[in-house]
Amino acid sequence: MRPIFTGSPSIVQGGFNLDVENQHFAVGDTVPAGTLAIKDEVKRTVQVIKTAKVVEVDAENTKKVSLYVDEFYEPCFAVGDLVLKDGTAATAIADVPTIEKIERNGNNYVVVLSKAIAGLAKDDVLVEVVSDGQAAAKSKERGTSNSVLIADVEVGEFETSVDVSADTMQYAMYERRVPPIPAGQKDTTGDYLKGN
């Protein structure tokens, strides 16, 4: 594993598990270290902020989107995830594309969407969104991160234990070495996380 932290993160004591009841994961996938997370101290569960950088949008089929992969990182999207371009305003859930298929082949990671995302281009960030639960449901961010995954986590068939940091402030991360951080997770300066 390459270094992603500039110091030693403070690990939250006690067991946490990935919240597979409220978030989709594919068994065998790896959630990369440095992924922003939302820990629930009461339920002892963790949800993650799923993001990926766009490498290419297929010119002939704009529903096919290639995402960035390297030797240390692969996105952790799952079939059924709702996704939008980072920075998109709240959108009617009926108009939000879902991931219908994921194609992996070596260093290629392609998602096939239920509908194209207008204006999506190379270097944009794709981010998972959720419903706001209202009668006329619209998209919203999953939530504000309050921790970070300390190490890569392989998704298991049943419970998947996760080590997370105590918060997002006690140390710094190399931003280019972690999954893309959505603008909505940053403060007004763009240099710090809101959930500090």
Task: State what each model feature region is.
Residues M1-N196:
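Surface-exposed, low-hydrophobicity beta-strand/loop segments enriched in small/polar/acidic residues
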